[in-house]
C-alpha cells in the first residue's frame, strides 16, 4: 500500500520538531502534501490508498483531540476514500473511527510506550528500540497478548493492522527481516491495507 505521509514543514529535523499550529496551517499542509503524493502515484498509474501523519504531527495528533479532529475533518471532506493509518489507541484513531473514516491501527516495532498508549518521547533513554532481538520480542509480545505493553508492564488491548519501523532507526534492515520471519512463523500473512479495512 502507498500512502501520503504528511508532516510539519521541518526538513532540517525530518518533521520531528513540534510546531505551533492552527486550522489553516494544518489544512494547507495536508492539501499540499496529499495532492503531491496523489499526483505522483497517478503518474505511475498506481493509487494512493491511505494517509498517515508523520513525526511531530503524528505525535501531537495522538494526544491532542482538537488537532486530530482537524486532520480527520480535512480527510473526510477532501479525501474520503483514503484509509487513516493511526497509532493504536490514540486520539487520532478514536476521532477517525467516530467520524466514520476507514481506520487502520498501527503499532511500533522500534519505540516503547507509556501507560496512556502514547510513544515514549525520544529524549527519554531507551525510547528507541535498536536491538533486533528486543524489537522482535516487543512485537511478538504485542501480537500474542493483543495489547500494547507499556514500559511499566501495563497491557492496553487493541486491534493491530500495521507495524511501523522507522528506516533511520539503527539496525532497521535487520529488524525488518526478523519481523518478516516472525510473522511467517506465526502464519500471519502480509496484506494491503485496502484488503484489511
Regions found by a protein language model. Give the residues of each.
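C-terminal domain-boundary segment and adjacent tail
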Residues: 82, 174-197
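Flexible, glycine/charged-enriched surface loops at secondary-structure junctions
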Residues: 41-49, 147-159, 189-196
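Hydrophobic faces of well-ordered beta-strands that scaffold small-molecule active sites
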Residues: 2-6, 49-53, 84-86, 103-107, ...
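Glycine/small-residue-rich loop that forms an oxyanion/phosphate-binding "nest" at active or ligand-binding sites
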Residues: 11-53
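Charged helix-capping and loop-helix junction motifs
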Residues: 64-70
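Active-site rim beta-loop-alpha module in soluble metabolic enzymes
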Residues: 89-147
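Glycine-rich tight-turn/loop motif centered on a GG-T
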Residues: 12-27, 61, 118-130
Amino acid at each position: 500500500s502507498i500512502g501520503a505521509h504528511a508532516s510539519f514543514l521541518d526538513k532540517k529535523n525530518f518533521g520531528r520538531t513540534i510546531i505551533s499550529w492552527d486550522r489553516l496551517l494544518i489544512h494547507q499542509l495536508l492539501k499540499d502534501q496529499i495532492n503531491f503524493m496523489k499526483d505522483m502515484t497517478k503518474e505511475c498509474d498506481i493509487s494512493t490508498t491511505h494517509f498517515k501523519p508523520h513525526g511531530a504531527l503524528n505525535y501531537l495528533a495522538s494526544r491532542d483531540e482538537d488537532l486530530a479532529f482537524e486532520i480527520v475533518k480535512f480527510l473526510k471532506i477532501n479525501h474520503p476514500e483514503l484509509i487513516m493509518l493511526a497509532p493504536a489507541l490514540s486520539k487520532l484513531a478514536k476521532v477517525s473511527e467516530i467520524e466514520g473514516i476507514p481506520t487502520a491501527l498501527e503499532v511500533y516495532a522500534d519505540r516503547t510506550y507509556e501507560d496512556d498508549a502514547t510513544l515514549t518521547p525520544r529524549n527519554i533513554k531507551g525510547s528507541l528500540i535498536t536491538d533486533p532481538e528486543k524489537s522482535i520480542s516487543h512485537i511478538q509480545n504485542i501480537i500474542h497478548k493483543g495489547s500494547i505493553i507499556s514500559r511499566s508492564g501495563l497491557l492496553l488491548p487493541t486491534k493491530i493492522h500495521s507495524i511501523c519501523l522507522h528506516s533511520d532507526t539503527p539496525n532497521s534492515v535487520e529488524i525488518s527481516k526478523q519481523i518478516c520471519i516472525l510473522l511467517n512463523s506465526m502464519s500471519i500473512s502480509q496484506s494491503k491495507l485496502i484488503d484489511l479495512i
